[in-house]
Amino acid sequence: MRYLIGIDMGTTNVKALLFDEQGNTAGEARCPSPITLLPDGGGVFDPEELWRLCCRLLTELLDAAPAEARSRLAGLAVTGMGEAGVPLDAAGRPLYPVIAWFDPRTEQYPAWWRDTFGEDRLYAVTGLKNQHIFTANKLLWLKEHEPQVFGEMRRWHCIPDYIAFRLTGASAMDLSLATRTLLLDAASGTWSRELLAHAGIPADILPPAVPSGTKVGEAVSYTHLRAHE
């Protein structure tokens, strides 16, 4: 019997679940998400705190798991909140707190897209009616209000693929999350150079968009997880 781990990086809770190939639960660990709520109704997360919490939950999960499960782990998948993400520098270090998906600081940008690009064209490319929550609007906010961070950024990861990156060293984004960036060409499933150029966002900061279930790399060892609790 092989075992699998699922991680859910949620806005309210972070959860790790161990289960067998028949879908039977063999273990669970959870903890409230470390969000800092702001007076204006926004919120932020510390990327390093999210990573440490993930390591702690995985350690708790595996410490309590049967020895058979620990020796027969076949895979690990990460899901979680959409739209929010982490700007990383050339060394893969976080440059700025995670802006929560619901944070209102980006409310001005749907009007910018409407006036400079057009709602109909935006919908034709992305399949989305623009809202302030989408990732592209967070990148526009960083470009306008944190130009040094924007200039030093070499990669943008949404939260689930940031955790996958920390676990594996591999850079990729699930297509379902990529659709929530407002930067994906929905017809081709690739990043829209038209939208990126219009927004002044470098195309190479976005990781490859891959289908759910794609193997992106090998996860770190149990010992490595314990060292990062």
Predicted regions and their residues:
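Beta-strand segments within the central parallel beta-sheet cores of soluble alpha/beta enzyme folds
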Residues: 75, 154-158, 194, 205-212
